[in-house]
């Protein structure tokens, strides 16, 4: 089977550092190849080049992983599906300009690989999607890539590993002595003087994440966060916000959920 996977084209695949969607696409492609499938990764911002690459490869199936390319969906004459990785998909009140893309999904009604049941319900309730077009397919992780230690080097340290931005809310927690941060910074409110480790490479992620006791992810919006799966692969527990709970069994002792009402009083 020949499969085309379409990425955003905004950074390399595989990424050198930050880039969850790009990492997912790379791991997905390699997993499919291991199963004997022929896989094409298309990673360009030019929609005409996307369509040309699909035509040349002549795949049996096309998987689009970039919401903006919903406009290409009617122009692809192959079996196909979309996956949205938009962090606020379960929070319509936070969509802002994304609502235009969401409305396009409603208009076109593509097949959608939903990252959680919650996301599936959003499409059903807000866009009246037919059930047969929605498929729940949570993210996975390449567990073989991660170093694992029974005894971490820093068991009393927690790691906040994510792009430092408004959605992830790192600035609210940067004065916690036991919390360390890694990720590229796009939030000017964050002070790099406090336990900041810079932007980790993929090699650092695979090797060093296991050295910490827990992963912290207290975003105000998530789809199905890859970094949580990476934390599990490296042997960490997780401390999460209500918005990062997708696909998790909250009865597990290594998963701690902080209610939103307590987010601003953490010390």
How would you name each of these model-derived features?
Residues 118-119, 137-146, 185-187:
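Short beta-strand->alpha-helix junction loop in the catalytic core
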Residues 220:
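Aromatic "clamp/platform" in nucleotide-sugar-dependent glycosyltransferases that forms part
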Residues 3-4, 61-64, 74-92, 112-113:
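Active-site proximal beta-strand in glycosyltransferases
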Residues 92-94, 124, 138-156:
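Acidic anion/phosphate-binding donor-loop and adjacent secondary structure
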Residues 113, 150-168, 174-180:
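Conserved donor-binding/catalytic core segment of Leloir-type glycosyltransferases
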Residues 92, 107-133, 141:
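A short, active-site helix/loop in glycosyltransferases that binds the activated sugar's phosphate group
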Residues 237-241, 247:
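Short hydrophobic beta-strand element within catalytic cores of glycosyltransferases
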